[in-house]
């Protein structure tokens, strides 16, 4: 795979709580230079990133209900509308993990479906994070089925905040479960070109990483 093709699959990510405006400026500069798909940042910096990336072809992605997924559905929906209004093209939203672990799949489905409807209503791409490191195989499959049924654009492995990230096995399984109707984003622990290529080979359509520059310049 050519470097430029790989770069175009990367969400250049900086979601640390201590992220400064200078960090975001640097992130956007790198994203423009290397032609990454998006920058993925916390909501407070959407306006900054949107201004810096205007006309560059690099999108602005942000996170919703992040990283716990325990925000009320109504708040998640309002976050999506606000993100769009401030310049975000894509949103990465976390499922309510506690509901999933409780087996309350109906509530999980309603939460995600409302978020997907809100995102698509305002023309925003939505990626649903299921936090694979916290789920059993059975729970991962059930979550994948719900994401597929919701009409989401992507299913995403991880927030990177739960002590585990993407694995090749998880990416391969998620792709098998959602089929061609939903894309897969691998995120968490992708720090090398080798790992990135393994994720793509397993079925990942997008990669979330803070190591994008290192990955494409080795």
Curated annotation (Swiss-Prot):
Location of the active site: 92, 156, 185
Pathway: Carbohydrate degradation; 2-deoxy-D-ribose 1-phosphate degradation; D-glyceraldehyde 3-phosphate and acetaldehyde from 2-deoxy-alpha-D-ribose 1-phosphate: step 2/2
Localization: Cytoplasm
Gene Ontology molecular function, alphabetical: deoxyribose-phosphate aldolase activity
A GO BP annotation: 2-deoxyribose 1-phosphate catabolic process
Annotated EC: 4.1.2.4
Gene3D superfamilies assigned: Aldolase class I
CC annotations in GO: cytoplasm
Catalytic activity: 2-deoxy-D-ribose 5-phosphate = D-glyceraldehyde 3-phosphate + acetaldehyde
Domain of life, source organism: Bacteria
Main subcellular location: cytoplasm
InterPro entries hit by this protein: Aldolase_TIM, DeoC, DeoC/FbaB/LacD_aldolase, DeoC_typeI
Keywords from the UniProt entry: Cytoplasm, Lyase, Schiff base
Pfam families noted in UniProt: DeoC
SUPFAM superfamilies: Aldolase
Enzyme class, UniProt record, top EC level: lyase
Family as reported in the entry's similarity comment: Belongs to the DeoC/FbaB aldolase family. DeoC type 1 subfamily.
Function of the protein: Catalyzes a reversible aldol reaction between acetaldehyde and D-glyceraldehyde 3-phosphate to generate 2-deoxy-D-ribose 5-phosphate.
Protein's name in the database: Deoxyribose-phosphate aldolase
Gene label: deoC
